[in-house]
């Protein structure tokens, strides 16, 4: 099964479906922005205490519908309809979705939120696409891109963290970076 999935994605899947996946995150972003520009987010609280808005729900519906059309045989796990039962019956290959990553930032109107979709196989990401609804920027990549990375070309490292939920681990990591003179 793994070899079939890799061959399918390597030879055809990403190229064949990339435009559909880009359209998917663009549509989800448009749905999010419609709510973002309004005065009403329809905010609720999930069972874990985190916020949920109409934008999360709309984006999730758009993405779920699109992924079912793009790849009906590949399961979808989304933050908005996640359950432990999903994990028990999960295939080796599945889509992992966060339809609105940064809901607190969305609510606080910081413009710092994204739409995230990854294709996972054997617990490894083999394709991912991220959209920033406010800017309209979209990034994507796969293990098959064969892009070379020149480590010597990196002049400056930027660390990005959530403003709304920094943890002790985050603080410890920043202290570690500071201790090795990375600012």
Regions found by a protein language model. Name each.
Residues 131-159, 165:
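ATP-dependent small-molecule kinase catalytic core of the GHMP/sugar-kinase superfamily
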Residues 88-144:
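DPxDG-like acidic metal-binding loop motif
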Residues 1-2:
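Intrinsic-disorder-associated, low-complexity terminal segments enriched in Asp/Asn/His/Tyr and depleted
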Residues 32, 56, 67, 103, ...:
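Residue-level signal for inorganic ion chemistry
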Residues 152-183:
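An extended, acidic
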Residues 5-100, 167-179:
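N-terminal subdomain of lithium-sensitive/metallo-dependent phosphomonoesterases centered on the IMPase/IPPase/PAP
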């Amino acid at each position: 099964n793994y070899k079939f999935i890799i061959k399918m994605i390597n030879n055809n899947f990403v190229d064949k479906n990339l435009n559909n996946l880009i359209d998917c995150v663009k549509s989800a972003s448009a749905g999010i922005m419609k709510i973002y520009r309004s005065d009403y987010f329809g905010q609720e609280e999930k069972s874990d205490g985190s916020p949920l808005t109409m934008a999360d729900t709309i984006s999730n519906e758009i993405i779920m519908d699109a992924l079912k059309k793009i790849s009906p045989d590949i399961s979808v796990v989304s933050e908005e309809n996640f359950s432990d039962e999903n994990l028990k019956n999960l295939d080796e290959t599945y889509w992992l979705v966060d339809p609105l990553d940064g809901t607190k930032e969305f609510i606080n109107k910081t413009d710092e939120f994204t739409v995230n979709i990854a294709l996972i196989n054997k617990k490894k990401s083999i394709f991912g696409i991220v959209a920033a609804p406010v800017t309209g920027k979209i990034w994507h990549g796969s293990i098959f891109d064969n892009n070379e990375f020149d480590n010597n070309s990196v002049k400056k490292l930027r660390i990005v963290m959530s403003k709304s939920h920094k943890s002790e681990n985050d603080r410890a990591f920043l202290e570690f970076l500071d201790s090795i003179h990375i600012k």
